[in-house]
A protein has these predicted regions:
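The feature captures the beta-strand-to-loop junction immediately N-terminal to the Walker
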Residues: 48-49
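Helix-to-loop junction immediately C-terminal to a conserved catalytic motif
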Residues: 63
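Conserved ABC ATPase "signature" region
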Residues: 117-134
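Conserved ABC ATPase signature
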Residues: 139-143, 147
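Hydrophobic anchor residue at the start of the ABC signature
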Residues: 153, 181
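A short, proline-enriched helix->beta-strand linker immediately N-terminal to the Walker B motif
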Residues: 158-162
Length: 200
């Protein structure tokens, strides 16, 4: 069995930039221009580039939110479960839900497991990411930026994903908190055999 989870071959993503008076696109913006990559099980693939170079577009492609304009996007084997951790944890967390519901949101959407099972899983994952279980009934605004990112990571873990895409997961955090989150990601990768795509 291959350890390759995802493969991109000569992938291009173009967006319309200008249309003529008939509504036909005459110019395109080339957000991704001929990229090749492989994502292998258990590794961390780093995507580094300056602002506006297409990193976030690539993240959306990997998550299935965009389709290639040209080239091949290949998921090896069965349907892969992908999760994403965003740059700004507060904007990615539902402000009206208690934290335990946020952590298990992917399971609720998929209609998997009972509420009691989801609550137990939320407590287990909270401990793994360093959130005290007695705080799980609080809303996101009650937590610091670093704690909110830990909650977002726990949510990504709840569906047992094959790949987690991390879109600048520490850039909105203080330096000391950045180190804590990166150390947490390393520990979780070792414990769960996770595969990361880390965008910076």
């Amino acid at each position: 069995m291959s350890d390759t989870l995802l493969t991109l071959r000569d992938v291009h993503i173009n967006f319309p930039a200008r249309k003529n008076w008939l509504g036909k696109t005459t110019e395109h913006v080339h957000a991704i221009n001929g990229i090749d990559l492989q994502i292998r099980r258990g590794e961390t693939l780093g995507i580094v580039g300056e602002s506006g170079c297409g990193k976030s577009t690539l993240a959306q492609l990997l998550m299935g939110m965009l389709q290639p304009s040209h080239g091949q996007y290949i998921r090896s084997g069965s349907q892969r479960i992908m999760q994403m951790v965003f740059q700004d944890p507060l904007s990615s967390l539902n402000p009206r839900l208690p934290v335990w519901r946020i952590i298990t949101e992917p399971l609720w959407i998929a209609k998997r497991s009972s509420e009691q099972q989801r609550r137990a899983l939320a407590e287990e994952l909270a401990v793994q990411v360093g959130i005290r279980p007695e705080y799980l009934d609080r809303l996101p605004h009650a937590f610091s930026g670093g704690q909110r990112q830990r909650i977002a990571i726990a949510r990504a873990l709840s569906s047992q994903p094959d790949v987690i895409v991390l879109d600048e997961p520490t850039s909105a955090l203080d330096i000391s908190v950045q180190a804590q989150i990166l150390n947490l990601l390393v520990t979780l990768q070792e414990n769960h055999g996770l595969t990361y795509v880390l965008i910076s």
